[in-house]
Amino acid sequence: MNRRPFWPSFWRLARPYFVSEDRRAAWALLASITALSLAIIWVNVQLNTWNGAFFNSLQDRKFDDFQRLLVQFAGWAVLYIVLAVYQLYLNQMLQMRWRRWLTDHFVRQWLADAAHYRLSLADFGTDNPDQRIAEDFREFVDDTLALFFGLLSSTVSFLAFVGILWTLSGPITLAGVTVPGYMVWVAIGYAFAGSVLAHRVGRPLIGLNFRQQRYEADFRFSLVRARENAEGIALYRGEAGELEGFRARFGRVVGNWWQIMLAQKRFTWFSSFYGQLAIVFPFLVAAPRYFSGAIQLGGLMQIGNAFGEVQKALSWFVDAYVRLASWRASIERLDGFIDAVERARLLGAGLTVREGDVIAFDTVRVDVPLCAQTDADAVETADDARAVAAAGAVPANGVVATRPLVAAGGERIEPGRHTLVSGPSGCGKSTLFRVLAGIWPFGEGECTGPRRDAALFMPQNPYLPVDSLRAALLYPHAPEGVDDARLREVLAQVRLDDFTGRLDESANWALRMSPGEQQRLAIARALLQRPRWLFLDEATSALDEDTERAMYALLRDDLEATTLVSIAHRPSVAAYHVQRLAVTPRAGGPASLALRPL
């Protein structure tokens, strides 16, 4: 769990929206809901007075007063309903506006400076960012508003009804000592005892709720991973292993849920007893005055109602305890998530990548986190990232224990000089691409990479959004502005003729297309975007050699102003390059770079 004090963590999450560009609407809605809440309390005070008169009319058998009071009640009821409906409506409006702003604000931070990628490279003490963004922000907003307005209503209700209860209850003499407004002191003592006991009984729920969200997210992530890799699991016949993994993860969900059930069972024993006793308790305490004739039935009912309002206001902590536990857990999770994003963005301070028209490695040293997995090129998936995370938690200053991977010494790639990057698996070739892309944070020194708007990086497994084929072709740009005829032409060039009539079809193309088709779609993207620099990280590994040669010839001939920089293992690819950047591992030290003609 996060170790930051609770209230600074809360303020860090709550303040930004109310000073944002949407602050006027936020404060207007907050003020309106507050006004409606106060108006509802005022109606409750009027109904308390009505309550006394109504029951007195019953006791005195005054039918005319009875009829008149029923008409009054109808008016108060209509007013109460209108106020309650609009209070709920405006509350939900504020919930959605606040959640929308929070989600957009923190998703932008998560995506900025490749923080979302860097979070996968080391253990920052957080997990499942999708859970944090999709669910915890919703819970934070909903719980904050519910608790704020609940506390506000309880405070104002106490102030409104404590005077009524003081006046109606009168004094009581015990052992020769007269206690004025004795019902007020009884209500305070009753609520105080309940609050202390509620905290003692319900405290374990805070940690249990925190862990439950984590276990649920881990289980859901494993299901998504299985769905995305269904073919591989089926081919390996790994269903039995997956089932065991699912059972183990869901077992943690169930085990923690049992603990929550037991904790909530204990708390419900207490809260139910406390709530049921509160119904009859004021009448038991006030009964002597009623039977002595000091008050009428209406006065007794007013006392019961006022005591209930005061006791309910003072028992806010008891009634809201479960929600408070969930609220605190969500704030701790979100604060840890924001800390992790900020620390991830701090990484890379020692590695400077300038933008220019050439690639120059100067005196850069590229590092990799210390962990069991030494193949930096294999950090592609969530599972691989978890292996890298074995390096240990990232301290608050964002420093990660690393080892040198590649050391450069002034190698330069000039525009127009198609370059093949070669070397054994795991020596750091893909990591060099990540450095040039500006997303790899581990290392020291300076190097020059292409301008971001002039470069396109093509990984071995291209990303295909779940969207139309048109959007997948033009990713990451908006799917407008390119003529359909041009899109069909490019698809035909990369031998995807069967897809030319499906531009507006939406699908999960990563499942609909074979790996080779996906790689050819990525090549089609390059033909459309026409970058000055094109980096291919085994981007044709799923193609047969004839198709691979055809694709490289197409790139070379069609993109005359583009410099190709390729990582590939097939010797045939060398024919489409003029020089080789060799990455050579060295025993006991980082790999070296050497640029040679082909």
Label for each model-derived stretch:
Residues 1-44, 53-73, 87, 91, ...:
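Membrane-integrated ABC transporters
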Residues 35, 39, 48, 79, ...:
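A hydrophobic transmembrane-helix motif
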Residues 125-126, 338-420, 446-451, 489, ...:
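Primarily ABC-family ATPase nucleotide-binding module
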Residues 137-142, 208-228, 234-281, 323-326, ...:
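An intracellular "coupling" helix at the cytosolic face of ABC transporter transmembrane type-1 domains
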Residues 206, 217, 232-238, 281-282, ...:
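Cytosolic ends of transmembrane helices, especially the final helix of ABC transmembrane type-1 domains
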Residues 437:
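Helix-to-loop junction immediately C-terminal to a conserved catalytic motif
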Residues 462-511:
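Conserved "ABC signature" C-loop
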Residues 472, 504-598:
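ABC-family ATPase nucleotide-binding domain "signature/switch" substructure
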